[in-house]
């Protein structure tokens, strides 16, 4: 079974906890009327909970994230269940639970939870990315392309790492859909001066398409020397695995269409 590290990292590095404060004053000031209007209904509902329940909820979510980072999936689910019993309308719960299902390769359940998270946190790039990624690993290329083209418009300009990765996935989706000219243009969008692995992985992808495996491996080796942090390259490498270019570390080959 192939692991999808990217979704795991995304769920933990962007946990969406910004929607609620981690600490609550003993005597919180009454929110201004404009602040109330800016809150989503589920956010306001959370703030209406007793302080002790809010603290317990946040404690459970933080513990779930900690356990998830350690790949302790069933313990993560147990903590999420604690949080769910306190407050059900939380995108954090569904986003992280969906990521747990991804680790278990239960894609239908993952997609269902990610969609629930998206309903509660509109236009959140990390959640929308997760939906696109489920379509990507299940080979639903048009749906994946549609989602990633939406995500690229939502990613903040200062989040280049995610933005470049999304563009790479768009490139690969277009290749699968027969849009070769678009894919070629995207493969040449950045050069070696770019501060991401995009250039090298795009070159490798094009080499794989030409059945030039040696050249593809050379490009990946160069990327490995330049970006020597495994955490940086992991989502790019996993993308090639899920796309079908290379074998996973589990010895399985992705199914080509």
Annotate each PLM feature.
Residues 69-70, 103-104, 137-138, 172, ...:
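Register position in tetratricopeptide repeats
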Residues 25, 37-42, 47-48, 213-257:
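Terminal, low-structured helical/coil segments at or just beyond the last alpha-helical repeat
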